[in-house]
Amino acid sequence: MSSNNNTNTAPANANSSHHHHHHHHHHHHHGHGGSNSTLNNPKSSLADGAHIGNYQIVKTLGEGSFGKVKLAYHTTTGQKVALKIINKKVLAKSDMQGRIEREISYLRLLRHPHIIKLYDVIKSKDEIIMVIEYAGNELFDYIVQRDKMSEQEARRFFQQIISAVEYCHRHKIVHRDLKPENLLLDEHLNVKIADFGLSNIMTDGNFLKTSCGSPNYAAPEVISGKLYAGPEVDVWSCGVILYVMLCRRLPFDDESIPVLFKNISNGVYTLPKFLSPGAAGLIKRMLIVNPLNRISIHEIMQDDWFKVDLPEYLLPPDLKPHPEEENENNDSKKDGSSPDNDEIDDNLVNILSSTMGYEKDEIYESLESSEDTPAFNEIRDAYMLIKENKSLIKDMKANKSVSDELDTFLSQSPPTFQQQSKSHQKSQVDHETAKQHARRMASAITQQRTYHQSPFMDQYKEEDSTVSILPTSLPQIHRANMLAQGSPAASKISPLVTKKSKTRWHFGIRSRSYPLDVMGEIYIALKNLGAEWAKPSEEDLWTIKLRWKYDIGNKTNTNEKIPDLMKMVIQLFQIETNNYLVDFKFDGWESSYGDDTTVSNISEDEMSTFSAYPFLHLTTKLIMELAVNSQSN
């Protein structure tokens, strides 16, 4: 391909600087391409020139939310890799250490042509070092250096991105932080997505603490600090990315973070006239504020604009055309479902035991058993994942344009030196790019500082709930959110619970009814019980703010007016596909006597002690009322 002269040596650098600040108000974490060696700490055992395992470090590429990213090469093959060094301090509490290491091993099984591969994991006392595929460029630098990107070219990138995201969602992994720095390009101009699966291992799964100050790509439910963010958040980010490729600017961009947040929360953006109706229509369906109404990845793959010139290897198994349909009918049921009605493939068992460290007889046992234990399910998942990799490879072989890249895709370990000769010439990043990179870093860092101190964020602080309302983000548990697209077998799978971890409780009541029906039921119950509520705003359809008179009974001292209107907030969350949670929250008191002065002189402690019983009492009444109604229906 003529573009082998690498997008880093851009003569277009002169004009790229004025676009750049648009896409990169964020902490630039590793288009594994920047040359930013100032971050090095010479005393560290990870200094330039140091050896880790079979790798020798060349330089630091950048620093991300998880720690430094270094360029290194394999001492015998000369193969370039990137090392992502995760300091164990940033990881969730120490009792999660085992889970995190399992989770990172699970990521080693992900094999998709458009995902950065994880070759190996090296553990030390303080760090986990991920050895990952090296890709020299960022998609967005490439966009900026082009005068304009045709819809055709943008669609090719977009198809690759969506296919990779679909693949991960199918394997219960949500990215949650898709943004330009995570979209890299290899020398064939193929997209490679970095950091899939990593948002799960950050402390408390709190996105805002860990995201690098790039709210421009974050979905409304992420910036509002909602407790649950499922596959829908990736759809939103992909919508923003498609918009940027086609329009060369961000749909949501404002110097003021509060204004930016407001625009994102209300979905306020403009579509330029020059977009084709197909592209504009797709963007509109992706940037829908309410995640329940947003298009799904699966639906995107069936969109007409998306399907133009779509290479078949990008399709998931259930969307692939089957030429030999007739005789496949009886097999097709097995295809995506459980491995037990199929011959067990010994090769797969070997791969599984070497990558994940399971005992072989443990693997055979779990594949032959129909028992539904978390440990067995985890092994079955992993087996199915590898099995599917095999069929993906078959598809890729059939696709001429892709088959020459098969070698790198297949390799469990990095490819050999010969394949690398071309890219060695690229590592000389010219001086101008480096200077620009430094400038961009500087602006990203100041940008980030203002973002974290913005007073607007303060109003979210007290809403930070320590209650975990929603399931943990283990990749295995994300299956729950994926069931809609999943195989019939998926519904048998129960989340993995490690012995140490405590049971996660759901607070509130769960429902499988349609969300609008649930809300309707709640309003009927509230009306029957004589509560009042504020009219909900368009974006708060799923939240009810209400007042409810609570009769305190024996008023000994009539002068002392005890506030008697309890305020509550009821909110509907989506826990997983077709499974919702109604959450009740105490929200203070008002007085029906019309003067709120009395409320303020009760101390907060007194207030909460005094409120616990009334709150539970009213909540119970409401739940009973809902139960009665649902039976009478």
Curated annotation (Swiss-Prot):
Membrane topology: Peripheral membrane protein
Binding site for ATP: 61-69, 84
Region (Auto-inhibitory domain (AID)): 313-392
SMART domains on file: S_TKc
Crosslink position(s): Glycyl lysine isopeptide (Lys-Gly) (interchain with G-Cter in ubiquitin): 461
Main location: cytoplasm
Regulation: The kinase activity is positively regulated by SNF4 via sequestration of the SNF1 auto-inhibitory domain (AID).
Basic and acidic residues composition bias: residue spans: 319-337
Effect of residue 210 to A: Inactivates the kinase activity without affecting protein levels
Modification sites for Phosphothreonine: 210
Domain Protein kinase: 55-306
Keywords: ATP-binding, Carbohydrate metabolism, Cytoplasm, Isopeptide bond, Kinase, Membrane, Nucleotide-binding, Nucleus, Phosphoprotein, Serine/threonine-protein kinase, Transferase, Ubl conjugation
Enzyme Commission numbers on file: 2.7.11.1
Region (Disordered): 1-46, 317-345, 409-434
Compositional bias segments (type: Low complexity): 1-16
GO terms of biological process kind: cellular response to glucose starvation; cellular response to stress; establishment of mitotic spindle orientation; filamentous growth; fungal-type cell wall assembly; invasive growth in response to glucose limitation; negative regulation of inositol phosphate biosynthetic process; negative regulation of translation
Function: Serine/threonine protein kinase essential for release from glucose repression. Catalytic subunit of the AMP-activated protein kinase complex also known as the SNF1 kinase complex (Snf1c), a central regulator of cellular energy homeostasis, which, in response to a fall in intracellular ATP levels, activates energy-producing pathways and inhibits energy-consuming processes. The complex phosphorylates histone H3 to form H3S10ph, which promotes H3K14ac formation, leading to transcriptional activation through TBP recruitment to the promoters.
Modification sites for Phosphoserine: 413, 487, 632
Biased composition (Basic residues): 17-32
Induction of the gene: Expression of the SNF1 gene itself is not glucose repressible.
Family: Belongs to the protein kinase superfamily. CAMK Ser/Thr protein kinase family. SNF1 subfamily.
Keyword Transmembrane helix: no
Protein name: Carbon catabolite-derepressing protein kinase
UniProt miscellaneous comment: Present with 589 molecules/cell in log phase SD medium.
Protein location: Cytoplasm; Nucleus; Nucleus membrane
InterPro entries: AMPK_C, KA1/Ssp2_C, Kinase-like_dom_sf, Prot_kinase_dom, Protein_kinase_ATP_BS, Ser/Thr_kinase_AS, SNF1_UBA
